[in-house]
Amino acid sequence: MHLEFISREQYRHKEDVAYLNELKQRYPQAYIVPEGGTNALAIQGCSEILTPQDQDFDLICCAVGTGGTITGLIEASHSQQHILGFSALKGDFLKHDVAQLTLKHNWSITDEFCCGGYAKTTPELLEFMQNFEAQYLIPLEQVYTAKMLYGLFKMIERGEINPQQKLLVIHSGGLQGRI
């Protein structure tokens, strides 16, 4: 493996077609992965998360960074299922980005529980994470999965999730980033 460090100025061009073409010419064997990993292959791979046995779930929840996982889940879901994403970032841009990647409408993304933004935490989130892990013996990390479950539990407490619904919560990992 060869790592090549680039300047901030070069990084600003990470999505420019000319810059990407230059990289492809310099490194013809390279596979260039976009920041966050969302591309057609990521969506295809994430669509394989759901199996025929998952057809009975009414609500499928996942954490959202750049939109690849949720888009794959949306593509694999059937119209009676709702896919609910919990964004690690503040802003409606993710809704726009995901809408560009799918024609389906059985999904939503909330940024209400992003706790200030990407990789940011609150004392409440960290307390929830600690209590959840102690009770359920499932490790979480503070960037994505803890925010998703914190938000889901808050929505259940507030009566926003129908208790009769059958839920599937996707734990997408990220444990290497634990503090």
Where are these regions (language model features)?
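Terminal helix/beta-alpha structural elements that buttress the NAD(P)+-binding lobe
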Residues: 13-15, 54, 83, 146, ...
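Alpha-helical scaffold segments in soluble metabolic enzymes
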Residues: 19-22, 48, 52, 72, ...
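Small/polar-residue-rich loop-to-helix segments that shape phosphate-bearing ligand pockets
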Residues: 1-55, 108-128
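Structural motif
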Residues: 31, 59, 166-168
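Active-site-adjacent helical/loop segments in soluble small-molecule enzymes
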Residues: 110-113, 118-163
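Hydrophobic beta-strand scaffold residues
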Residues: 2-4, 83, 140
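Short, amphipathic C-terminal "tail helix"
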Residues: 154-179
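Glycine-rich phosphate/pyrophosphate-binding loop at beta-loop-alpha junctions
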Residues: 41-116, 170-179
